[in-house]
Amino acid sequence: LHGSSAASDVYKRQAFMLLGFLGLYYRGNKTFSIPELIELGTSGAFTGTFATLVFAVLFLGFAVKVPMWPLHTWLPDAHTAAPTVGSVLLAAILLKLGSYGFVRIAIPILPEQAKAWAPAIAILSAIGIIYGSLACLAQTDLKRLIAFSSVGHMGFVMLGIASLTPI
């Protein structure tokens, strides 16, 4: 996986997420404090094209981490290349960090953009559920099967997040 184009694509998408955080930093009183950024976001400090662009790049970065369809392409190769313990940790813990980013960062800081993007996130999640489940049926390698089942089960998580109901 090291040096592969899939890994390179993941790094590029993560760089976009970094740009989103830098935009929030410079527009939000030069702070990375999540509570302060949430307060600024809910008070209307982040609006218009800026807010939409920041939500888009945060979405892109977190969606790769989830992994959300169609940004999941790195996952089967990562599971296959990883030792079994690494594959289990990837499926059990690390994939949840993207959804945590949505719940704790993107949605609270940019709630209006989250509402606007929720239908698209729900559609992509539903496609991911179906795609991941069907791809599981075609797998003969257990690690790839776990990877595609992770795409499906994280689709359910993201579908719940897209509903924007209080936790």
Where do the protein language model's features map onto the residues?
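Aromatic-enriched alpha-helical transmembrane segments of multi-pass intramembrane proteins
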Residues: T47-T52, G128, I146, H153-F156
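Small-residue-rich segments of transmembrane alpha-helices in multi-pass membrane proteins
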Residues: D9, R13-G20, T84-Y100, S150-S163
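Single conserved hydrophobic/aromatic residue that forms the stacking wall/gate
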Residues: L1-A7, Y11
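Transmembrane alpha-helical segments of multi-pass small-molecule transport proteins
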Residues: A56, P119-C136
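Juxtamembrane/interfacial segments at transmembrane-helix boundaries in multi-pass membrane proteins
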Residues: A15-H72, D77, F102-A120, S163-I167
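Hydrophobic/aromatic positions within or immediately flanking transmembrane alpha-helices
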Residues: L89, A122, I146-A147
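C-terminal ends of transmembrane helices
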Residues: V66-T80, I130-S149
